[in-house]
């Protein structure tokens, strides 16, 4: 992005320096970053504003709303300071982390301020309500924050691509959470003690009715506890089956206002005719509605070498260009930036139709996207490697594999990458005749190469109108062509039997013959085995991993037939390979995070069983995210899988607060089910408030139609639907699991004090007593 800004300034300087120069930028990846940053910043501001609106609705009071509103910029500022001292830049991933953190960082402040506000409503003085309210939920808030931080911890210490993608974002989310914890336990109580002195908590009649209805429904659920539990498990199994059957894609599809057309003209055309066809294609593309700029460059290469600047004679250059299928072009197209995604797709389809109307050429239209840089590091589409030892056999086999892929539904533009091959002149030198003329084969080839190379390496300074330029001199006199090549003469030296030498000349036709042939444009090998790579694009509306299964089945069947040459084998890769790799990484991430989350909850609950109540809601809460993908028609991608990671760190928060508060009531002597109903009704408001603040912060990413939302919408849908479903899990499934697993009330362990040493082992008691007596003044 910074380079893009500098280049814009340089471009203006160049225009001022050279009058009449016209510069058109056809491709600019800095625009993607700019769009992403603007979209994420908008989401941050909208999310913060909506969070304040939610607080105002539920609390119906400006003062506590302002307290939480002040905590948002304080927490963000604290997180940005931590980012600065740890060397994190403000980029797309870190800003995405801050955007997610906006919705999560108010959770702690909401829980604390709601509890303080509730105590004020019961008549507790402001100062005492601030201290007591923060103390009641303090440990559960600390535990819920630490569990969320632990979920993102594996990404920081990972050594794979996951760290590069999620490491900065995970650190930003962790910084936001830790900042929100500090602010919630310090700034919020301190501000509440002052701001809420004269506050008069208002009754919410509509919410009281909702609480009463929830209490009655929870009592019925506890009486028939296995019915909702079984329904939740069955729904989870169904969603997992449906999503897996749909397949997983690497990255979501994204559109941009840039496209590239790969154009090939018919080989029989001359250079001028090829240029004429290319001009017609450009005119046809320019006529498409929405196209602003078009740039075209020739792709005249031979076996990967540019031959346009080697200084070869024109006849040889023409021969090489024709041999390589001269007439290959790259056309860059820039569309109107105001076009929506659907109109950009329509414009690309219109360009395909327009190019199809031009004779003597074939072309493919490909959109650029924000994910192109990432997909360049990972394989996309379908890739099949065919191994063997003979180039001709591999070429023939690859053509059959191309036919198999093209006949498989869901793939298009399958190719073996070999093309038609390059036309070559094969010179066959007769070694006996060469030796008879006193020459060597190496001398023959060296003289032919010297004749072909007509450009001197030395540069001659030439001054034109006061401007000095270095030029290379090219000798185009007597050019070597296919017709006169065999007339090339060589000086010979022949020694007779009596020891005398005789000099003379011979023509190339006297010692060699030539034929024409076709050579492959590339030869690749791996572990000393040659291979050909067949690639194909996934057609719109199809899933690569699902369709690749059909291709593999067809290849396995082909391998059992007599058409499969001996010594050849297939190896499938591409996007399915990358998907499997990323899925394994994500599963390992979750597997590493769960033990950390469990240990934090063990320390909080002082129980090995209580954490399982909360952990059991994690896979059930995934049901919400999967349902969201199914209902919106989204595919499971690597980005949406990150949403499940975020979900795993957030769904446990409300469960921790619920179980902790229920334990406090039961230790106070309340009956089990009565304590669960009372806990549900008491914690219902902060649970709904924290859920809504996070959900509303994500809505901007879902309903916006910009390019950034196309990339992040899958993750936002998973978080929104997952948290919404997790709210039901917390309000119903957590009480049901608690009722099943905890028949006895939790023990209230009295750890005593320093003055009471009766329960302390003798050695420790003597040590403490000795330290106390030594500290007393004599």
Predicted regions and their residues:
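Extracytoplasmic/periplasmic membrane-proximal domains and adjacent transmembrane bundles
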Residues: 6, 10-11, 15-49, 56, ...
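Signature of alpha-helical transmembrane segments and their immediate interfacial
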Residues: 137, 203-252, 384, 761-778
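Hydrophobic transmembrane alpha-helices and their membrane-interface caps
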Residues: 45, 49-118, 596-683, 688-704, ...
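Helix-loop junctions and hydrophobic alpha-helical segments within the transmembrane domains
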Residues: 26, 33, 37, 113, ...
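Transmembrane helices with small-residue packing motifs
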Residues: 84-89, 156-164, 195, 229, ...
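Solvent-exposed, membrane-proximal periplasmic/extracellular interface segments of envelope transport
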Residues: 276-377, 433-446, 450-456
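Extracytoplasmic/periplasmic
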Residues: 249-332, 391-424, 767-772
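Transmembrane alpha-helices and their membrane-interface boundaries in multi-pass membrane transporters
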Residues: 102-114, 138-157, 164-202, 620, ...
